[in-house]
Amino acid sequence: MVGVAKYRHLPHGRSNGMLADDLWLSQGDVDHCGVDLRPRAVEIAQSRAEKAGAAVRFAVLQALTEELPSGFDIVMCSLFLHHLNREEAVTLLAKMATTARHMVLVNDLVRSRRGLILAHLAARLLTVSSVVWVDAPRSVRTAFTIDEVQELALAAGLAGVTVSRRWPCRMLLEWKRP
């Protein structure tokens, strides 16, 4: 993935642990440590990993106020950035860049009219949960635009960052250590 035979991967905010489990199962020579600020989420993720036979570790951590674990080649977060304000997003991105030996990856929603329409439609078509009906559009409204994410990354010191659109209404931030 980043030109090393064995690498260490630190996903943040993936409360159910599915991403770390899936990566471990598809790529056995990877050291994964997932973090989340909620102890119950970490407990569920660890239990899930153990049942799947995945050698994945999880830790309770508040990434905005605590030091991230060191020594990871790739540090990533998925569907987490839109929960933060601008200052928090810059703080998180800077901490991720400091921690990552090789790469930072951020996958998140993009704030757009199209995304808002899709969130409304998908929430109504795919679930009967009134919580999802409210939360999906709210998440899109609090997300950043592509240009805003680019600005946040540069403010965090991620020179050379690329931010690209992904289907359906997502973005991928990629930064490689020079």
Residue spans for each PLM region:
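Hydrophobic adenine-recognition pocket in adenosine-nucleotide-binding enzymes
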Residues: F80
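A conserved beta-strand element that flanks and buttresses the S-adenosyl-L-methionine
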Residues: M76
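A short, conserved alpha-helix within the catalytic core of class I
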Residues: L84-M96
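Class I SAM-dependent methyltransferase SAM/SAH-binding core
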Residues: R8-T65
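Core SAM-dependent methyltransferase catalytic element
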Residues: V161-P178
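Conserved alpha-helix/loop element of class I SAM-dependent methyltransferases that forms part
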Residues: M1-R8
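Conserved beta-strand signature within the Rossmann-like core of class I S-adenosyl-L-methionine
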Residues: A100-L109
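C-terminal alpha-helical "lid/dimerization" subdomain adjacent to the S-adenosyl-L-methionine
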Residues: L109-L158, T162
